[in-house]
From Swiss-Prot:
This is Uncharacterized protein y4fQ. It comes from the Bacteria. The lineage of its organism: Bacteria, Pseudomonadati, Pseudomonadota, Alphaproteobacteria, Hyphomicrobiales. It comes from Sinorhizobium fredii (strain NBRC 101917 / NGR234). The keyword Zinc-finger does not apply. It holds the Pfam family HTH_24. SUPFAM superfamilies: Actin-like ATPase domain, Winged helix' DNA-binding domain.
Length: 392
């Protein structure tokens, strides 16, 4: 298991503020957190000892004594993210800044859960060795899957294209195979979390709603600093607006549309090399899909009143950008009298949203206050009963 200890609630508050502000002085941390200066000083000292953060002089300001800014030590801890398309599995290692430091694309030819897990495990081990990263510096592994959860946490109803994940077998296999915490999340929620943590340059982007265009039309939301999954992890599914027996604004629908026009692409990865002759088909699809997604924007605004709605997923970045342009090309009726729809933007993570989002899940569980379910934690006062090992 990693050397990272369980952080107190107050330590998580500070780390989360540093995550979101990317360079902040101690006095600002005290103001934003509501803690006393003495408490901030004590907690910052322990986080510095752990090697999780650094403090450096800011020499970009006026003359005189420079401010000292706290930032994450990006390469202190790492996480792995695993995400899937029909034919391939993408496995990445990300650092605390959300940067992908290594990636492997692995072909998937099997419906066997154990073979999928073994391939992911081999890819993670290979990347850690290539980067000389110790396993105890790996916070955990996040697995982003296209599917819905049943009433039991290990029961996953995967998209029909992903039989290896049916009935929770792969979930249990992932959790049993790795000697670090393994977290499984649906792809929409993982993408929303990655966008919130790593791409939100505005700390006021909460609530955030993510429309995830993958094989289906999924979604995710971050509300009050934590992913909102509902009772069983299946909240935020805008695809319910689009019947399966009719044209839908989904990635699979785009592949089917291209196939009907004579362009036989197996998966999203092949869209970057589409022939020029397919351009008119894609433009027609974007025009129709963008118009359909206006309804999702309106409904998401009505249900969640988000500060921002993000559109992203598995499509190439330029297609997502054109989808957003199409959505915004006509006025969208607000959800009620006098209420406008929420601002809409394209994902800043682009096609990396799935992999970075998956890797973000372990970081969120380890460092963010939203992952602490018990507000009555014994760690609330910022102290813990057991000593820990400082960074070497």
């Amino acid at each position: 298991m990693p050397v990272l200890p369980e952080l107190s609630l107050n330590e998580r508050r500070l780390v989360e503020l540093i995550f979101k502000n990317r360079g902040v002085a101690r006095i600002e941390l005290a103001q934003m957190s509501g803690m006393t200066g003495a408490t901030v000083t004590r907690l910052v000292a322990s986080l510095l000892d752990l090697g999780l953060i650094t403090e450096e002089a800011d020499r970009s300001g006026a003359q005189g004594q420079p401010r000292r800014l706290l930032q994450l030590q990006a390469r202190r801890f790492f996480a792995a993210g695993v995400t899937f398309s029909v034919t391939r599995m993408e496995v990445v290692i990300i650092d605390l800044s959300g940067s992908i430091v290594a990636t492997r694309s692995v072909e998937v030819h099997t419906a066997s859960p154990m073979e999928v897990v073994e391939a992911a495990q081999a890819a993670v081990d290979d990347m850690l060795a290539a980067l000389s990263i110790q396993k105890n510096d790996l916070v955990g592994i996040g697995v982003s899957v296209p599917g819905n959860f049943g009433t039991a946490s290990n029961l996953l109803k995967a998209h029909p294209f992903f039989p290896a994940f049916e009935d929770g077998q792969a979930i249990e296999a992932f959790r049993e195979a790795f000697d670090v915490p393994c977290h499984v999340e649906n792809d929409g929620t993982a993408a929303a979390l990655g966008e919130y943590v790593f791409a939100g340059d505005n700390v006021l982007d909460d609530p955030l709603f993510f429309i995830h265009i993958g094989h289906g039309v999924g979604g995710g939301a971050v509300i009050d600093g934590r992913p909102y999954g509902g009772a069983h992890g299946n909240a935020c599914l805008p695809g319910v607006l689009y019947p399966y027996d009719q044209p839908r604004p989904s990635g699979q629908d785009l592949l089917a549309t291209l196939h009907a026009a004579g362009f036989h692409l197996r998966d999203f990865e092949e869209m970057d090399a589409m022939p020029q002759a397919a351009r008119s088909t894609v433009i027609e699809w974007i025009t129709r899909a963008g118009a359909q997604l206006r309804q999702a924007v309106r409904v998401a605004t009505a249900f969640f009143d988000p500060a921002r709605i993000v559109v992203g997923g598995r499509l190439p970045g330029d297609l997502n950008k054109r989808l957003v342009e199409t959505i915004l090309s006509e006025p969208i009726e607000g959800p009620s009298r006098g209420l406008p729809t929420a601002p809409v933007s394209v994902s800043r993570l682009g096609i990396r949203a799935g992999a970075v989002g998956a890797g973000c899940v372990p970081f969120f569980r380890a460092f963010f206050t939203g992952a602490v379910a018990n507000g009555g934690s014994a760690y609330l006062n910022g102290r813990r009963p057991f000593p820990r090992t400082p960074a070497q």
